[in-house]
Amino acid sequence: MIVKCILRKIVTATCRRAVGPALLSMLVSLVVAVPIASADDPKAREIMERVNDRDDGDNRISDLRMVLIDKKGNERIRETRSYAKDRGDDTLSLIFFLSPADVENTGFLTYDYDESGKDDDQWLYLPALRKTKRIASDDKSGSFMGTDFNFSDLTEPDLEDYDFELLKEEEVGGHMTWRIEIVPRSEEVMDETGYSKTVVWVRQDNHVVIRAVNWVYKSRRRKFMQVTKLERVDGVWTSLEIKMVTKEGRAVVHTTILQFSNVRYNQDLSEDMFTVRRLEKGA
C-alpha cells in the first residue's frame, strides 16, 4: 500500500496521501489464501491519515530516470517525463517514456479518485501496436513496464480497505520513525494490489514514508522499498530517489531505482492534457 503512495508521489508527481502518489507503490513471505484477521489501531490509522493529508505540492512536472537491474547485475535505463494535476480532491497524472527507442512514446494515464470505494482509472498506450489498453482491476497487480512496481502502486490506496497496527518507534537514518503494519481487510484487495501485507516506516518530523516492506500475495517474494534521497523542493518534502528490491528468500531477483530531477511545482497544466487522446499523441 505504501509503495503505491510513494511511487505515485514520485512517479506521477503527486501524492496527497501516503506513501501518488504517488509511488505510489508505492510494498514480505506470509502467503495467505484468506483474509488476515487484524485489529485496527486508531493511533496507527491516524498517523497514516496524516501521511495521506500532508502537503505534497500542486501541479507538478518532473523527469524520471528508471534503472532496472536483473539478478545478474545487467542494467537497463529508461527515461520518462511525468505530469500531474490536482482536480479537486482527485489527481490526474500522465507519464511519457522518452527512451530507449523500443518504449519511446509509450504513455500511462491515471485518474486517481479520492472517493472511497471508487475504482481508479488507468490507461496504457503502446505505440508499437497503436493501441491503448485500459488496465482492469484484476491486472493492477502486474508489473509496470518491467519494473518492481505494480500498476496498483501508481494510485492512492483507500485507507478503508486496510487495518493498521503501530508496531514500535525506532530510529532510521538519524530520524525517529513509526513502524506500522498494514493488512488488507479482504482477499479481494490482496488480489488486486498483489500484496498480502505491508510494513512501513514513517518519519515523525514530516510524515513521509521512507521505508517499506511488501509481502507479495501468494508468493515467497518480498519487495523492499527505501527512499534514498529526500529533499525539500519549493518547500515540499520530495522523494528524489527510491530503490525497490524484490527478493525471494535472501536472493535478489530484481531491482528498480527511480531517480527524479527537474522537479517543478505549481505549473500551469490544462486538464486537456490528461485525456486518452493526448496520451496517444506521445511526448
Regions found by a protein language model. Give the residues of each.
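N-terminal mature ectodomain segment of secretory-pathway/periplasmic proteins
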Residues: 42-128, 165
